[in-house]
């Protein structure tokens, strides 16, 4: 039987950070993953450029049934700490927008940096390795694996959620949590495109590929970014963000004119452009195709001077408060994250250690902590991995 001090299951962002940090403080660390490569999600993230953190990270950027849980870890390993690591390795990066930091070159720069740190600190990495059984024993945990029997003092679960199963996502971490008496909060896809009802399919299909700056709202949350029409429904940053707050049957409200008071703008057009058709004026804000389709779907296009006060009010309402009830989401297949997971009320916010089973730790996406779009989920991976590594 092989013995080590720390076994980390899951060689993604959180697992790699935990491994290199624990090994860096002198712990003997074994990092295990069932995949044939480490950090697959890192490689595909950010369109291949890895949005590795956000300069404006704060606890308000995270969803959890236990809102205060993430505060301690985020304060002890900040975005600036990770940016310092990136700078130390000479990885060039830039801010794209809204504090989102991306590699100048490719995501493999970030993965390479983490793997280099693991090599330097002496982490033992084992890929293509499956866990068959875990048992609590005196002084730690015993694992039956395809490598043989392992024994460790500390066991860290960094297996992620259910999103993007083609990259190897499974519910393994949730099974371990249940085995050791933890409550699981219901899981669902987050940061995911919406599918739409039949009556909207024609409009979305016709506008497929069109991107529009909007204010999207649901359940007292709002995001101002682009939406993207697709053949399947609605996507784009604003839709992905609001999807984490949406539940089946909820109404989503889209303001297509976020820079204007729609009613005032329409009245202004009646004065300044009385002979212009509304679709022509909207064509200066949206694409001409979108303006024409909105005219066909929502109102009769005619010279501005011909609209009554009631018609102007009705059009303003549609443009500033387009209400729709999505049919659903595209699910885990395309979701960037998994909402829900291991109930954080049963985990120490300081150490990430289980309050049910000493020596067992949970980090990253397996926990009920989900960030907004824009590098926040990676920052949670770095911060939670670092926190556990101080104690594991």
What are these regions (language model features)?
Residues 4-31, 388-392:
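N-terminal Rossmann-like FAD-binding beta1-loop-alpha1 element of flavoenzymes
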Residues 7-9, 32, 131, 150-166, ...:
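Short hydrophobic core segments
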Residues 23-47:
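Glycine-rich FAD pyrophosphate-binding loop
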Residues 36-38, 43-44, 52-59, 92, ...:
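An anion/pyrophosphate-binding glycine-rich loop and adjacent beta-alpha core
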Residues 49-95:
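Glycine-rich active-site loop/strand segments that organize a redox cofactor
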Residues 76-154:
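Feature captures the FAD/FMN-dependent oxidoreductase FAD-binding
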Residues 127, 292-370:
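A glycine-rich dinucleotide-binding beta-alpha-beta segment and adjacent secondary-structure elements
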Residues 154-197:
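Glycine-rich loop(s) and the adjacent beta-strand/alpha-helix scaffold that form part
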């Amino acid at each position: 039987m092989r013995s080590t001090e720390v076994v980390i299951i899951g060689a993604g962002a959180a697992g790699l950070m935990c491994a290199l940090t624990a090994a860096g403080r002198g712990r003997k660390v074994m990092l295990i993953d069932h995949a044939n490569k480490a950090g697959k999600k890192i490689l595909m993230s950010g369109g291949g450029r890895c949005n590795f953190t956000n300069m404006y990270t704060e606890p308000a950027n995270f969803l959890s049934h236990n809102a205060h849980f993430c505060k301690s870890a985020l304060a002890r390993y900040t975005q600036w700490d990770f940016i310092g690591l990136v700078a130390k390795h000479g990885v060039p990066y830039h801010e794209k927008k809204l504090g989102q930091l991306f590699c100048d070159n490719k995501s493999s720069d970030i993965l390479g940096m983490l793997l280099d740190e693991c090599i330097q600190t002496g982490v033992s990495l084992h890929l293509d390795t499956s866990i068959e059984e875990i048992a609590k024993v005196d002084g730690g945990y015993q694992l039956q694996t395809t490598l043989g029997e392992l024994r460790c003092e500390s066991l860290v679960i960094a297996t992620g959620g259910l999103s993007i199963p083609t990259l190897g996502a499974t519910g393994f971490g949730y099974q371990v949590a249940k085995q050791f008496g933890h409550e699981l909060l219901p899981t669902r896809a987050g940061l995911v495109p919406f599918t739409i009802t039949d009556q909207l399919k024609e409009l979305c299909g016709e506008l497929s590929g069109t991107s529009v700056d909007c204010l999207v709202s649901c359940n007292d949350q709002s995001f101002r970014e682009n939406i993207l029409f697709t053949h399947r429904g609605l996507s784009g940053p604003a839709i992905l963000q609001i999807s984490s707050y949406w539940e089946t049957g909820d109404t989503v409200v889209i303001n297509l004119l976020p820079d204007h008071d729609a009613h005032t703008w329409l009245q202004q057009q009646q004065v300044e452009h009385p002979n212009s058709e509304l679709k022509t004026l909207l064509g200066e804000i949206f694409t001409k195709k979108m303006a024409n389709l909105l005219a066909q779907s929502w109102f009769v296009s005619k010279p501005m001077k011909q609209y009554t006060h009631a018609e102007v009010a009705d059009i303003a309402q549609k443009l500033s408060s387009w209400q729709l009830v999505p049919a659903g989401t595209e699910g885990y297949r395309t979701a960037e994250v998994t909402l829900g997971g291991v109930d954080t009320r049963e985990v120490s916010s300081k150490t990430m250690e289980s309050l049910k089973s000493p020596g067992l730790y949970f980090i990253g996406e397996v926990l009920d902590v989900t960030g907004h779009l824009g590098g926040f989920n990676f920052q949670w991976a770095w911060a939670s991995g670092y926190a556990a590594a101080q104690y594991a």
